[in-house]
Amino acid sequence: MKIYKIACIPGDGIGKEVVPAGQEVLAALASSSRSFGFEFENFGWGGDWYRAHGEMMPAKGLDALRQKDAILFGSAGDPDIADHITLWGLRLKICQGFDQYANVRPTRILPGIDAPLKRCRPQDLDWVIVRENSEGEYAGVGGRVHQGQPIEAATDVSMMTRAGVERIMRFAFRLAQSRPRKLLTVVTKSNAQRHAMVMWDEIALQISGEFPDVKWDKELVDAATARMVNRPATLDTLVATNLHADILSDLAAALAGSLGIAPTGNIDPERRYPSMFEPIHGSAFDIMGKGLANPVGTFWSCVMLLEHLGEVEAARTLMQAIEQVTAEPALHTRDLGGNATTQQVTQAVRDRIAAMARQPV
């Protein structure tokens, strides 16, 4: 029996509630399958670790994760610690340290979800947003001088490399090629950003020649937001820069019903390092400890984790269980207009997994 080693990093806020919920459903899948199992190791990094040690994770933290098969992450963010410290000290340290250059965010309207768009059928909103996850606007290049003085100045430099753009474009075209519609939209802002984004466009055109069966178009990022709202059915796979995709994917999740249901995978496609899977929602300290957090985003992230490990049948089972649960309004959490608790949703998903395991093959 294959045993997968999973690093679990709850992080901050409701991450401490949804990651254990994710472990529960993964364990339930393993129990019903008997062909694989999980060995979980929990890491208490985040805001509490920072208060005790002055850093969000240990200096050699990446070494502790390096031999894992995957990472399940909760959230980073603490109201008492500056956001750039919590993000750069933990999540981005892992993403960049393990060169998880492809951030993949699927979005669709799940059964039972009352999405806010009028005249939008569930089949009209079925997207995957590919986010360049290693450079661009979040490269960390820049600085501040003369702090606190009238002449203070600061820069954040968006840095793009040919190698970085080529690999994310190739990844996005390949992903689009694997989907039924074989359709890719390259999001840009080359009308105003006349250097790096022009290179981005040129490389997209270059890479498109390797995928003649993929139909692709180009859209300015501001126009892309309007298109997502007004013509969602014209989109399928999108690729965008670090900042642009960060914003667009949150909009996508809201259009599908809630940030609480949205997953993401930070992927190293070459599999040199473990990839990391997480819900896209934040730490939500206002509801922490109240049992109100929606664990569906974490469960869907676990689907992506299973797919990455090659456990396709288990991933399909978990996705079916999720859809059966979201189809029942009585099992909707507060963000979806219901009153169900985190544990009630978790138990319901576990029950569906067990029920499917009892069905004759």
Q: Where are the language model's segments positioned?
A:
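N-terminal glycine-rich phosphate/adenylate-binding segment common to multiple enzyme folds
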Residues: 50-155, 243
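Buried hydrophobic positions in well-ordered alpha/beta secondary-structure cores of metabolic enzymes
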Residues: 12-15, 69, 130, 172, ...
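Glycine-rich phosphate/diphosphate-binding loop of Rossmann-like nucleotide-binding domains
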Residues: 7-24, 29, 149-221
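Glycine-rich phosphate/nucleotide-binding loop
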Residues: 47-50, 227-330
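Short glycine-rich or small-residue beta-strand-to-loop segments that form or flank ligand, phosphate
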Residues: 5-14, 72-77, 184-190, 300-307
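Glycine-rich phosphate/pyrophosphate-binding loop and the adjoining helix
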Residues: 140-186, 190-194, 312, 317, ...
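Buried hydrophobic packing segments
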Residues: 22, 26, 204, 298-306, ...
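N-terminal beta-loop-helix "entrance" segment that forms/cooperates
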Residues: 35-59, 228
